[in-house]
Amino acid sequence: MRKASTRPLRILAPTRYPWRFNSPRHSRHAITNQPFLPMNKIDERIEGFTIFPPTLRRYDLVHAFNRIPVGRTPYLIGFESHLPRAFSLESTAYFRALTKSLAGKRCRGIVAISRYSERIFRKTHADSAVAGEIYEKLEMRYPNIEIPAVEDQAPDLNGPLQLVFVGHHFARKGGCVAVRLAELAQEAGVDMRITIVSGLAMGGDIWTDPARDEYYETWADRLERGNITHHRSLPNDQVQTLFRGAHFCLLPTFGDTFGYSAIEATANHCPMIATRQGALPEFIEDDSNGILLDLPVDGDGDWIHSSSPDRDTPGFERMFTDEIERLAETALTRVVGYLNNPARYRALRIEARRTVETMFAASDANEFWDRRYEEAVG
């Protein structure tokens, strides 16, 4: 372990929101956030590394996320699933060069954001010639959030059931499930209102989705139901207000590495309805602090149909529709079960908030990251 530095350090970091969840919210060091060059916009095959714009200022350390920074400055790097990000290129010289950087002296730490991502990393590099070097640098640290000092508003179970779905990638994150749930509730006479915040990105190259545009032609019309309110986007403070007044937050996702909206919702006492995939089962416990819906996953915890070569076929579309139906039916059954047991529902909200306070508090993360910066540079 390196000796810790005692002076304030100059840290260079990216600007995007995943880094915000995986960094100190407040630091005794001087952190400069700058946009990096998005190499994936040039070619998706080279998204595994990044370059920060040239600057005359010298930095002690780069705190990167997902993409390995080019240059001479030492770096720490966090990651959400695969590192290096070089999908299907694991046998290439390019992948070996990126891995060599992780094993080299510039890399001062590799931080997985979940057991899910740590597991994938170890599997990816199990046969690497430098496995020992990179495993020695590997550790796990969950994302963090500044937990709002708000009392539980505990919406009345006798009024309309209020659910919230937030996700730009509409189909991937489970927006179709939310729409179908609203339809099933109305058909069953259950008074349910679902607020959807989504830019409605779906299909195309999104790796979980049916690829053909024709598949989605009816979904926009189905958002016009009387028990659905749709916003293309909202400021974050308004989303937080929605969480506080909701009975559940929906994330019946087909592909999420972590699900940051899940910790934002539960920080506001709102339990989750989510799928058992990615890192979600690490902090959502079924019938304890939320509802977990089963999804067929592989050994890594990813949906077995992710990145299917058949996404543009009618067969894939039928399978996707069947999964939407199954998840929506199960969600409705589970939610209605809590209507008849208010004490059990209140316990769910209490445990949801307690989980966030225990696992994701920013105060603990601030100290962790500041100490890691000092150890990396010292």
Enumerate the language-model features and the residues they cover.
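Short alpha-helical donor nucleotide-sugar binding micro-motif in glycosyltransferases
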Residues: 233, 241-246
